[in-house]
Structure formats: C-alpha cells, structure tokens
Amino acid sequence: MEALHKKIREEGIVLSDQVLKVDAFLNHQIDPALMKEIGDEFARLFADAGVTKIVTIEASGIAPAVMAGLNMGVPVIFARKHQSLTLTENLLTASVYSFTKQVESTVAISPRHLSSDDNVLIIDDFLANGKASQALISIIKQAGATVAGLGIVIEKSFQGGRAELDAQGYRVESLARVESLAGGVVTFK
C-alpha cells in the first residue's frame, strides 16, 4: 500500500535492525486519513471472506481494526491486556510475549462476544514473531469460532511470524512488508 510505504519512509524511525518506531502515525499519534485508507484496504482484501467479527489486541490494533469494521459493517472486539471490574466472567485468555516491550501478558476476551458462528478477521499493527497473532488465534479457537485471516498493517518479514502462520495455513494480508531495517534504512519486500 503506497500511502503506508510513504508514511513509513517519511515518519518511521528505525531504532535498531529489529525495531521500527511508527508512533507519529500509528501507535501513539494516529493519522485518521491513513487509518481510513488502511481500513478500506483490509475491507477490500477480505470482502469475500464472510467476516462476522474483527479481533485485535489493545491498543495499537484498535484504530485500523475499527476503520475496517466500519467499512465491513461488522463489530470489533479488542483483547484486553489489563483486567477490569467489568471483565470477569469465564474469560477466553491467552499469554502473549511482546518483543518490543519485552514483557509477557495475558490477553482476554469475554465469551459473550465470540461464538462458534463467528468467522473472525484478526487485525494488528505489526507482525514480527507472531506471538500476538497466535494468542488471538488461541482465543478464537477457544470460542469455537473460525479464523478468516489476518490483516497486518506492517509485517517485519525478516522475523518468523509470517512463516509460522503460513505453515499453519492461515491467510495473511500485510499492507507493508519490511524486508530489512539494516543500516537504519527501511527496505520493503
């Protein structure tokens, strides 16, 4: 997606050969016009998938997921990283390790929002080692629902997440595939 590539080139900051900072438009400050384009593109890519719900993890996946949900006319559920007084009943949970934050957390979704009738599109801001995606897949399976596919805003193709998801037979659509961050330069696949 050219608009996303341009934004990454102009406003993304390479912190290391493993870490790309995109807080100027995606995961701290949000560019609404770009999020609309991203949502439109996910809706186009998965128009034939029979999606009934979209699932993401708080917080950075919420903006692109909501835009896709708006375009597709389906609800968006975000897996919560923090327990709350209102999220208590027999939760669907999975552990996820964050490469960027270097912490493991438990994410949860209420079973009231997912059922075996659902065909779920996972949307996330990044795909690196695939741990967040695998956690969401686990939660969706616990509900007896089906995974329609995964929509990824930025994929770090040099890490193993995509290969693992491909090997499991999941459809993965990434809007920007980063091949390398070597030398402080973003190289797209």
Curated annotation (Swiss-Prot):
Gene3D superfamilies: 3.40.50.2020. GO terms for biological process: purine ribonucleoside salvage; xanthine metabolic process; XMP salvage. One of its GO terms (molecular function) is xanthine phosphoribosyltransferase activity. GO terms for cellular component: cytoplasm. Its EC number is 2.4.2.22. It catalyses: XMP + diphosphate = xanthine + 5-phospho-alpha-D-ribose 1-diphosphate. Xanthine binds at residues 20, 27, 156. Pathway: Purine metabolism; XMP biosynthesis via salvage pathway; XMP from xanthine: step 1/1. It is found in: Cytoplasm. InterPro entries: PRibTrfase_dom, PRTase-like, Pur/Pyrimidine_PRTase, Xanthine_PRibTrfase. Homodimer. Belongs to the purine/pyrimidine phosphoribosyltransferase family. Xpt subfamily. This is Xanthine phosphoribosyltransferase. It comes from Pseudomonas syringae pv. syringae (strain B728a). The gene is xpt.
